[in-house]
């Protein structure tokens, strides 16, 4: 009992004590909280009332961090872009956010141009509709943003950044950064992303439409900072997207494709010359005697087709009394690669479908003759179109060279030049006639994302551009940092400029032929990153990796260049252009340097050899013309043939003479070209131009000491490489 009483007394005392203590603790905590709140309110009032410094006003801009997994999951597709513009349409008509919406593809042009879509939204009980089109621009370049060509209210280029951008200030900073390159390229036409391009479609700021472009842009940027909810209209899925207005311009890629696209012209040739194609004598007269057998074969194919069609009409209960002209038209429609429509056939729809299948089946059984006929007509049309379009091709090449020279003058390397990234600026009222005269239009830049200013900054450095490029227009140097390129080459600025030189050369070939020059060599880029990584893992020096990659690339490029030049020699020699003055100045400097370097090489070669030892014979070699050197070589070869055991000195002399002739002939040709450039008006063929450009690239970007591996047991003769390069320039 006493223990129980003692416990109760202890418990009672503890409860009373704790109650008193808790009262004081709660009071202290409440007082402290009140003081903290009061101090916070005073701090906020003081902060809002004091003047804001410039440093405080400045918005902190941070580059958003993303992971490859995020990019893969959130990749933006054409469907996402279509949905985006469907929502823009909803905002424009004022429909509810939950209004029913539909999209439908109307046509897909097989030539690769935009797909047209119909956008439909139910508003006030009625379906509102409009159209838009979308298509990809260019080849994916790995490290570069993806672009689409969209027509919606205006012609737009929509650029999706590689890494999602979530912060508006970083997005705006990126736009301004591109503007710095554009300012330096002025007055060349360039288009850059602008927020006003798309925002003004859903909200027009009062008085902004009559402002200069830059002022209007600043007004929209300020408005978006204050009205942050509108920033979402610059986003697709999780990222801000760049929008460029292309309404005033034309794509160079579309123009080049149209110059060489003979598909429609072939169909027109077939449909307009029915009597010629189905009459062997007339076929021979139009397409040449060598094609006579093809004319006979296609006439036989038509006879088989006509019999099958007439039997089909009888079996279908249709009068067999169908004119020969109608059946010829149906046959020629399929020969042109098209199908007969219900209106043209004047038959029930189900029969038209069967008719098309029947004609297609008949042609497939004689596909060899059909293909030969199509190829003959295509070749004929291409030849006619080529002659008609040569002035436009020459004009494009002239303006490509003018752009290249301008980039060099402004010390800018675009590093991803290609037809899809170049605009054509001319008077729309005169299109396409202005293409006949290069002075009536100019080429400009669509996207400057990969560009770099190679004029050294105050600290003597050149900014590091994005690595990577479009394989058909890029060199291995696109994949190495400035630091590595500076170590591998003597002149980083020159290498950056030559990246544009290479792309321009490829575009010149495409403008003249409609084809890519280095399709096989471009495949090296699929493995180039792996070679770089494996080289690093093996502990190779960066310069050794550059040499290894360059060796494989340039050997392939040299062989492919020679092959393509031989294939297209007649076409390329027939296109003449007048070199712009800016380009002549650039070319003359290159030629002078090359002549000097080759002359030094000749002297070094003669001094280092042992076959001709006396000072007199060496001087004679130095003074001799290529023809004299060649004559001497023939004498030595005849002497070797007459000897049972010729000495090694004789065989060495023959190798030396071959090499000397190559070098001297190269100097002679370069001097002739230099003399031509000194004239007030310098005309040159596309063939000579391409040879000169490739020669400079090969010697500048593929160093002589890289021609063979240092560990190779057998060193190739320098003459073999120089001879091959020379053949490409003859």
Predicted segments, located by residue:
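ATP-binding glycine-rich phosphate-binding loop
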Residues: 73-156
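Conserved short submotifs of the Hanks-type protein kinase catalytic core
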Residues: 234-251
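ATP-binding glycine-rich loop module of kinase domains
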Residues: 136, 143-212, 265-298, 302, ...
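Conserved activation segment of eukaryotic-like protein kinases, specifically the C-terminal portion
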Residues: 461-487
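Activation segment signature within eukaryotic-like protein kinase domains
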Residues: 396-397
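Catalytic-loop of the protein kinase fold
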Residues: 404-437
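Helical subdomain adjoining the active site within ATP-dependent kinase catalytic cores
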Residues: 74-78, 279-343, 513-730
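Short beta-strand micro-motifs within the conserved protein kinase catalytic domain, predominantly
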Residues: 193-237
């Amino acid at each position: 009992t006493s223990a129980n009483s003692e416990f109760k007394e202890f418990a009672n005392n503890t409860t009373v004590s704790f109650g008193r203590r808790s009262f004081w603790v709660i009071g202290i905590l409440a007082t402290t909280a009140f003081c903290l709140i009061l101090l916070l309110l005073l701090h906020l009032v003081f902060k809002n009332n004091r003047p804001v410094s410039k440093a405080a006003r400045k918005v902190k801009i941070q580059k958003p961090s993303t992971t490859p997994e995020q990019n893969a999951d959130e990749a933006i597709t054409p469907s996402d872009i279509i949905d985006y513009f469907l929502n823009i349409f909803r905002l424009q008509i004022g429909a509810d956010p939950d209004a029913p919406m539909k999209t439908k593809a109307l046509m897909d042009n097989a030539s690769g141009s935009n797909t047209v879509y119909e956008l439909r939204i139910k508003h006030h009980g009625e379906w509102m509709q409009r159209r838009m089109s979308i298509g990809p621009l260019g080849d994916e370049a790995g490290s570069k943003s993806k672009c689409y060509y969209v027509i919606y209210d205006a012609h737009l280029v929509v650029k999706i950044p590689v890494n999602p951008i979530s912060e508006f200030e970083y997005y705006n900073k990126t736009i301004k950064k591109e503007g710095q390159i554009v300012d330096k390229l002025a007055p060349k036409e360039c288009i850059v992303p602008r927020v006003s391009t798309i925002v003004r479609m859903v909200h027009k700021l009062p008085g902004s439409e009559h402002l200069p472009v830059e002022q209007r842009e600043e007004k929209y940027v300020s408005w978006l900072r204050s009205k942050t909810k509108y920033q979402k209209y610059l986003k697709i899925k999780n990222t801000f997207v760049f929008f460029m207005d292309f309404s005033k311009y034309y794509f160079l890629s579309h123009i080049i494709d149209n110059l060489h696209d003979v598909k429609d012209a072939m169909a027109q040739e077939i449909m307009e010359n029915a009597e010629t194609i189905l009459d062997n004598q007339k076929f021979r007269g139009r397409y040449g005697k060598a094609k006579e057998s093809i004319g006979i074969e296609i006439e036989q194919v038509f006879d088989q087709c006509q019999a099958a069609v007439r039997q089909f009409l009888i079996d279908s209960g249709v009068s067999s009394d169908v004119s020969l002209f109608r059946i010829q038209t149906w046959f020629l429609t399929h020969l042109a690669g098209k199908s007969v429509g219900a209106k043209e056939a004047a038959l029930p729809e189900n029969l038209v479908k069967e008719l098309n299948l029947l004609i297609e089946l008949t042609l497939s059984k004689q596909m060899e003759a059909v293909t030969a006929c199509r190829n003959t007509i295509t070749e004929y049309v291409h030849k006619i179109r080529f002659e008609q379009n040569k002035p436009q091709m020459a004009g494009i090449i002239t303006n490509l060279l003018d752009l290249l020279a301008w980039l060099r003058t402004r010390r800018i390397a675009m590093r991803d030049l290609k037809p899809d990234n170049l605009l054509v600026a001319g008077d729309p009222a005169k299109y396409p006639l202005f293409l006949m005269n290069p002075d009536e239009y100019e080429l400009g830049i669509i996207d400057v994302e990969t560009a770099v200013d190679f004029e050294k900054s105050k600290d003597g450095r050149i900014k590091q551009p994005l690595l990577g490029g479009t394989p058909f227009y890029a060199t291995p140097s696109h994949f190495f940092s400035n630091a590595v390129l500076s170590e591998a080459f003597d002149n980083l600025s020159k290498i950056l400029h030559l990246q544009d030189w290479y792309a321009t050369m490829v575009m010149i070939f495409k403008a003249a032929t409609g084809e890519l020059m280095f399709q096989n060599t471009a495949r090296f880029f699929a493995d180039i990153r792996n070679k770089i990584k494996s080289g690093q893992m093996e502990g190779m020096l960066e310069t050794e990796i550059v040499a290894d990659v360059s060796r494989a690339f340039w050997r392939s490029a040299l062989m492919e260049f020679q092959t393509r030049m031989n294939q297209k020699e007649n076409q390329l020699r027939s296109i003449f252009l007048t070199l712009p003055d800016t380009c002549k100045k650039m070319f003359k400097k290159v030629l002078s340097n090359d002549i000097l370097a080759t002359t030094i090489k000749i002297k070094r070669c003669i001094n280092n050899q042992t076959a001709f030892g006396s000072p007199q014979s060496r001087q004679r070699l130095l003074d001799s013309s290529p023809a004299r050197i060649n004559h001497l070589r023939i004498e030595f070869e005849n002497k070797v043939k007459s000897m049972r055991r010729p000495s090694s000195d004789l065989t060495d002399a023959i190798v030396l003479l071959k090499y000397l002739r190559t070098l001297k002939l190269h100097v002679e040709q370069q001097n002739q070209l230099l003399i031509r450039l000194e004239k007030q008006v310098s005309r040159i063929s596309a063939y000579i131009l391409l040879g000169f450009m490739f020669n400079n690239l090969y010697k500048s970007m593929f160093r002589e000491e890289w021609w063979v591996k240092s560990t190779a047991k057998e060193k190739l003769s320098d003459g073999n490489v120089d001879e091959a390069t020379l053949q490409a320039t003859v």
